[in-house]
């Protein structure tokens, strides 16, 4: 099993990510022997201590019986990092993990067990959205965690995994913004598996940042489906049921106001395309 972690200037987050991985329950074959685990940190375009943080986990990985591979890639590109890490990955089960995400203790074991077998499969855990610090992001979270895409599908943002037959669905990662959506839509809804354990996922902080991230997300989705129209057949993003939106607005009026304002502002022309951490 290979865990692939693209990381761009993630010194503040990577330590917690790797620590959470190392706290995972044992992943075992049916005979009780440990499954070989390889962790590939693909540092790309880093000007901070990301690589040093990763190297600091070498002895702990060794004690666990895991293999740590650190790639120091000059160019800052998540897609380039994913492809470079894939080229070094040795596991049939591939987990793609963002460096600012913390896995639950049973998520690796559940992932391994769910992805056994010859048929193409995709799996992800439940998304536990960390409560933000700022008012706007907290209000936005109240609605975002309850939208149908979160409650009735398997989003996979931040953590997704495929088995060998599933990974054969595509060759290299194309140069797209929505890499997680690109992979999810390689599978129809009957090929995706929702795991019971969760991963902690961070929402971006601040109204302007929410707008930037939402705009980037929407642009990435449009571009992806325009370039790969065959993937539209596997899109199962549900809409609100009748009355559901109204009930949410009555229960969380401030949250709904912020959520709608972000959606509206994200449709306006962007002044710049500055990158913002987090997703919405």
Task: Please place each PLM-identified region on the residue numbering.
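Terminal low-complexity segments of carbohydrate-biosynthetic enzymes
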Residues: 203-204, 212-280
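Short, acidic, metal-binding catalytic loop of nucleotide-sugar glycosyltransferases
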Residues: 19-36
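A conserved acidic beta->alpha catalytic loop
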Residues: 20, 40-53, 75
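Acidic helix N-cap motif at the loop->helix transition within catalytic regions
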Residues: 13-15, 48-57
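Conserved donor NDP-sugar-binding/catalytic core segment of glycosyltransferases
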Residues: 105-135
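Cell-envelope/extracellular polymer assembly enzymes that use nucleotide-activated donors
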Residues: 1-2, 38, 182
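Short aromatic/hydrophobic "clamp" motif used to bind/position activated sugar donors
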Residues: 94
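Glycine-rich, basic loop-to-helix element that forms the pyrophosphate-binding segment
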Residues: 71-89
């Amino acid at each position: 099993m290979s865990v692939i972690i693209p990381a761009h200037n993630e010194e503040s987050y990577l330590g917690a990510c790797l620590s959470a991985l190392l706290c995972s329950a044992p992943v075992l074959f049916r005979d009780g022997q440990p499954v070989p685990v390889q962790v590939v940190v693909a540092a790309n375009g880093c000007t901070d201590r990301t690589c040093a943080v990763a190297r600091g986990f070498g002895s702990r990985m060794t004690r666990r019986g895991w293999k740590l591979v650190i790639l120091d890639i000059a160019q800052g590109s998540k897609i380039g990092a994913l492809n470079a890490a894939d080229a070094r990955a040795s596991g049939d089960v591939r987990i793609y993990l963002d460096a600012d995400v913390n896995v639950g203790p049973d998520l690796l074991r559940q992932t391994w067990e769910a992805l056994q077998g010859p048929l193409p499969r995709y799996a992800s855990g439940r998304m536990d959205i960390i409560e933000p610090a700022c008012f706007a992001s907290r209000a936005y979270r109240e609605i975002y965690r309850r939208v149908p895409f979160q409650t009735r599908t398997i989003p996979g943002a931040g953590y997704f995994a495929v088995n060998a037959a599933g990974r054969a669905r595509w060759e290299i990662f194309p140069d797209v913004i929505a890499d997680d959506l690109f992979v999810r839509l390689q599978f129809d809804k009957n090929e995706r598996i929702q795991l019971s354990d969760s991963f902690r996922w961070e929402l971006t902080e601040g109204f302007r940042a929410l707008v930037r991230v939402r705009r980037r997300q929407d642009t990435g989705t449009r571009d992806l489906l325009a370039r790969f129209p065959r993937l539209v057949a596997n899109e199962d993003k549900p809409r609100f049921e009748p009355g559901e939106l109204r009930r949410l607005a009555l229960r969380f009026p401030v949250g709904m106001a912020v959520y709608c304002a972000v959606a509206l502002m994200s449709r306006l022309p962007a002044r710049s395309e500055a990158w913002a951490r987090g997703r919405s």
